[in-house]
């Protein structure tokens, strides 16, 4: 009896050479709060991320109004359950301005909390992309947040991790401010689109090691 012919791959078939799992930790804005399309900036980023030979899985682990200390206490226990033992594991940390509401808030303590997250991830061989906090309409709050944003940026830079500064370009951005005013302080469709644009154009593809889309 002649051997059965092997079925050829269908047109467009590609072999998945890279298996990537991304755990994204952050607050309610990471989860798309304020976006009437319920996609959020994170969904927009993922929609613009595809490459031949790459299988990407993502897991959103969001807690509203979370401080860096709270994030640091939970991220590994939650993210590690989503990570793979055989593929690539990556971490996205979306920071908020919640540390400003602490009674004994200080940039030094916030720096240490973020440093602990990045150091733990580095020890486990997990590349990290950090998205900095976004500005509000409260200028006095923004002045304090500017200091915190600079501290976060320094922590990430010292450890060679990618830091996307969302605060500086959005602080005086008319469309961002109009979106916050219309949404009761939350970014809407336009605001989430602006965050996504910053992430996509500030090192996302290089961090993942995939080519940028041509269109």
Residue ranges of model-derived segments:
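Active-site segments of SGNH/GDSL-like serine hydrolases
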Residues: 94-100, 117-147
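Serine-esterase "nucleophile elbow" of acetyl-processing enzymes
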Residues: 2-64, 77-86
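Catalytic His-Asp segment of secreted/periplasmic serine-dependent ester chemistry enzymes
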Residues: 134-215
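Oxyanion-hole/transition-state-stabilizing segment in secreted/luminal serine hydrolases
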Residues: 35-38, 69-111, 136
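Cell-envelope and extracellular/periplasmic
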Residues: 29, 61-66, 92-102, 157
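Structural recognition of the beta-strand scaffold that forms the well-ordered cores
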Residues: 22-24, 57-62, 89-94, 127-132, ...
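A general structural detector for well-ordered alpha-helical segments in enzyme core domains, enriched
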Residues: 41, 45, 79, 110-117, ...
């Amino acid at each position: 009896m002649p051997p059965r012919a092997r079925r050829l791959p269908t047109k467009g078939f590609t072999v998945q050479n890279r298996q990537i799992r991304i755990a994204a930790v952050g607050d309610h804005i990471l989860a798309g709060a304020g976006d009437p399309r319920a996609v959020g900036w994170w969904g927009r980023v993922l929609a613009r991320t595809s490459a031949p030979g790459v299988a990407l899985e993502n897991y959103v682990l969001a807690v509203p109004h979370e401080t860096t200390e709270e994030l640091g206490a939970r991220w590994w226990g939650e993210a590690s359950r989503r990570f793979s033992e055989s593929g690539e594991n990556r971490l996205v940390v979306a920071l908020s301005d919640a540390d400003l509401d602490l009674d004994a808030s200080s940039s030094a303590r916030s720096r240490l909390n973020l440093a602990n997250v990045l150091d733990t991830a580095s020890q486990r061989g997990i590349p990290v992309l950090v998205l900095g906090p976004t500005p509000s309409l409260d200028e006095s709050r923004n002045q304090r947040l500017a200091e915190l944003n600079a501290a976060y940026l320094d922590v990430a830079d010292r450890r060679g991790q990618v830091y996307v500064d969302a605060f500086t370009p959005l602080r005086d951005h008319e469309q961002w401010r109009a979106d916050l005013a219309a949404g009761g302080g939350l970014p809407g469709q336009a605001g989430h689109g602006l965050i996504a644009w910053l992430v996509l154009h500030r090192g996302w593809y290089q961090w993942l090691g995939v080519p940028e889309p041509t269109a």
